[in-house]
């Protein structure tokens, strides 16, 4: 079993218009590479996909949760019917807070609805809770030694082994694609102090149950409640973030917080107002067809008319490859679908690097109005990048690589015409 590596986010304080927003933390994630029967995302380029070939930046071996295509094997599939096993657990020193089904209801059906909207109906997420009461662990929570940043060994292995022993008489683990462990929120510290929520994905060294390893398992602990009164609407969002790791997506925040991507992807910020995934991630997960992606790989001028990412159908993404491991993605973001906090719609431009580890900044959003302070004061939304999208008449320039991306105009239907020049 390879040494566990973890990605930790520091607290980030964000101002609210009416009240002080409390410090927020995101979850950690761990990937333990190994063989698995299924992989997520689009398949490798076929001959008929030749025009897209240069834009399929390659998955980089040895990189945790590489942004490359196709997604490495070992993760849960991200299209079609996905069965999610949910087990609500408590401990002798932390008995269940409320009923177990009330804990389940904190996340569902909201999580399933979030994936339905984000995937344009391509992911059918089916949450199941075959055990409707609290699943009591045989040891106190303190005995497992779980803290933020804890490796899989020995604490989580021991916890998973106890979960399997306790649940196996009533659960057929082989029937499920992923596992969510919904811990009673009074086990461990408040999320305002430190977030324990974590995902172990691609971990074929995990304990087996009913002939399968619990290789893609998310753990959710205390409630991500910032005191703004929005928990009932937004508190569930930690689970789509954690399940994003199960599908092979990396953490986009860094040790400095969400300053590289902001609120433009739930893998960057999962506190506060609802937000969606980047178009690159939707292509990676198989939620966009190849026909919805344009590839500006050749020298010269390329023009694309892009429809809002929130809308089903139509051209969604233009990509400008810089190397076999990096390039610029171009998409249209509006306040619709899962994107609740968009205060300045427009064309979002960001750099994707497949040779950068999760939590080290594999994606960087280009800010059209640097040091502006942004256009939002919503709690737990990275303000500076909230006005990052480019508007008609504005141009992004990368002189070192000879790239100019200009937003030409927006039509009455909200489609944006984008011109990309390569020299």
Task: State what each model feature region is.
Residues 2-36:
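Secretory targeting and sorting signals
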Residues 3, 57, 65, 208-223, ...:
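Non-catalytic C-terminal accessory/binding modules of secreted extracellular proteins
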Residues 21, 54, 234:
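N-terminal beta-strand/alpha-helix entry module and adjacent surface
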Residues 34-35, 41-231, 240, 395-396, ...:
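Zn2+-dependent metallopeptidase catalytic core
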Residues 52-60, 294-296, 374-376:
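Sequence contexts marking disulfide-bonded cysteines in secreted/extracellular proteins
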Residues 95-96, 190, 276, 339, ...:
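Intrinsically disordered, low-complexity acidic/polar segments
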Residues 97-109, 277, 342-344, 363-366:
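Short, polar loop/linker segments at the starts of domains and inter-domain junctions
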Residues 173, 178-180, 186-341:
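Extracellular hydrolytic enzyme modules, especially secreted metalloproteases
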